[in-house]
């Protein structure tokens, strides 16, 4: 599916006004070959621990988007080249991460969309802490499981339902 978030905002100004379509703050950068991605949100809330990220990406993605509230930590990465390849193999459409990625050159080779704050060479811990399928606070919007995410180079949108 090809789209532009700018066009979606223009076409759905009524939903923007109602709050059923929300724009995340412009702090996310794309780190993959994919120019745009969208899908139903699966949410995680973790902090500097990516064990739950891996466990989730090991499941069939079925075109969904993994939305991770990593607390905005810039101290370590929660997604790198191996997890991006795993996401691609299992059919995930994308990842939106309020935190860091690493292995940026490897991420540029995958077709799974990845939007994150920045990079960090340090890996996250693997303690297995965190929560799944909860509402998460990302810069600019609350994201609930089952909502829809649309992302491209211009930004990341969250919609209460799939957009036409």
Curated annotation (Swiss-Prot):
It catalyses: 4-hydroxy-4-methyl-2-oxoglutarate = 2 pyruvate; oxaloacetate + H(+) = pyruvate + CO2. It is an enzyme of class 4 (lyase). Divalent metal cation. Substrate binds at residues 80-83, 102. A divalent metal cation binds at residue 103. The keyword Oxidoreductase does not apply. One of its GO terms (molecular function) is metal ion binding. Homotrimer. Belongs to the class II aldolase/RraA-like family. Catalyzes the aldol cleavage of 4-hydroxy-4-methyl-2-oxoglutarate (HMG) into 2 molecules of pyruvate. Also contains a secondary oxaloacetate (OAA) decarboxylase activity due to the common pyruvate enolate transition state formed following C-C bond cleavage in the retro-aldol and decarboxylation reactions. This is Putative 4-hydroxy-4-methyl-2-oxoglutarate aldolase.
